Amino acid sequence: MSAPFVLAVPSKGRLQENTEAFFARAGLKLSKAGGARDYRGTIAGLDNVEVAYLSASEIAAQLSRGLAHLGVTGEDLVRENIADADKRVSLIEGLGFGYADVVVAVPQAWIDVRTMADLDDVTTGFREQHHMRMRVATKFVNLTRAFFQNHGITDYRIVESAGATEGAPAAGSAELIVDITTTGATLAANGLRVLDDGMILRSQANLVASRDADWSPQARETARVILDHIAARARANKYREVRTRFRQCDAALLGEAHSRFGVEAPFGGPTSSGMLTLHCPPGQLYALASFLREHGAETVSVVSLDYVFDRENPLFAKLEAFLRR
């Protein structure tokens, strides 16, 4: 039997809950045979798939080493922990949860420091006055170095943070920080604020593929099935299915509906009996229903879609293109 296809997912907390819910909505149920404490699982209906439950940072490491084919982790951890990330992994799809911004934050008392250019001036003056470099507390050493280098800032030193980074300036262990934030409330509570141009990265949980994994034909087929489910669910979220029947419908009317409401006719124009099926963005449903009735439709029904499978799978095409590079 060939080596298993490995999908690495978060092992605890909200990230695990959101990840399992995401795959469940796509028709891919993750399960643990040994119960909640088990760190290995399966996907119902997919043979030879091993679900590895790991910390988000461990997932990035496994992807980097080719020990997982696909993994769910934050882009911040990918960029921080994987050198030349764009060559070694591919961010296949943002998953819409796990949002966090990696930012440069300074004490609110620094009223004259609004930008990275201001910070550059302050770091130079700080070194001249105190005969030491300004300290930046962070867990994101590589992202910080790259961002500061891009802004020409050199008079600083990094203090690697083991605990709550936002408390470092108040504790006297650093002058400023680079950290993640979602609302900014924790930064504000610790007397910090984000520089106007201090956004290093807007991160979210991503489905990430590893170049160095064993992409056998069987592994590629497993990835195709998984990504087909995810793409079908994503398409379904974009539309509602609209059904109606009226003989007055023609190509010109469909063209107008497409241009005005963004609808698609996935099965072509109306049948000989006038039956018509359209896919419509949710925000345009009432406008479309009114338009159809104005042109002769007696009844217009709307149903939600679970999946919309197309011949083309953009997610798998993205993976294949990445592996060919």
Curated annotation (Swiss-Prot):
Asked if S-adenosyl-L-methionine is a keyword of the record, the answer is no
Which reaction equations make up its catalytic activity?
A: 1-(5-phospho-beta-D-ribosyl)-ATP + diphosphate = 5-phospho-alpha-D-ribose 1-diphosphate + ATP
So which domain of life are we looking at?
A: Bacteria
* Molecular function (Gene Ontology), one example: ATP phosphoribosyltransferase activity
Q: Can the keyword Glycosyltransferase be found in this entry's annotation?
A: yes
EC top class, in one word?
transferase
Instruction: Give the cofactors, semicolon-separated.
Output: Mg(2+)
Task: Give the pathway listed in the UniProt entry for this protein.
Answer: Amino-acid biosynthesis; L-histidine biosynthesis; L-histidine from 5-phospho-alpha-D-ribose 1-diphosphate: step 1/9
- Per its UniProt record, what InterPro entries does this chain match? ATP-PRT_HisG_long, ATP_PRibTrfase_cat, ATP_PRibTrfase_CS, ATP_PRibTrfase_HisG
Q: Which GO terms describe its biological process?
A: L-histidine biosynthetic process
Q: Which GO terms describe its cellular component?
A: cytoplasm
Keywords from the named record = Amino-acid biosynthesis, ATP-binding, Cytoplasm, Glycosyltransferase, Histidine biosynthesis, Magnesium, Metal-binding, Nucleotide-binding, Transferase
Where does it localize? Answer: Cytoplasm
Intrachain disulfide bonds: none
| Activity regulation description | Feedback inhibited by histidine.
Classify the main location. Answer: cytoplasm
E.C. designation(s): 2.4.2.17
Family annotation (PANTHER family):
ATP PHOSPHORIBOSYLTRANSFERASE, ATP PHOSPHORIBOSYLTRANSFERASE ATP-PRTASE
The record's similarity note reads:
Belongs to the ATP phosphoribosyltransferase family. Long subfamily.
- Explain the purpose of this protein: Catalyzes the condensation of ATP and 5-phosphoribose 1-diphosphate to form N'-(5'-phosphoribosyl)-ATP (PR-ATP). Has a crucial role in the pathway because the rate of histidine biosynthesis seems to be controlled primarily by regulation of HisG enzymatic activity.
- For this entry, the protein name equals ATP phosphoribosyltransferase
Q: Species name for this entry?
A: Bradyrhizobium diazoefficiens (strain JCM 10833 / BCRC 13528 / IAM 13628 / NBRC 14792 / USDA 110)
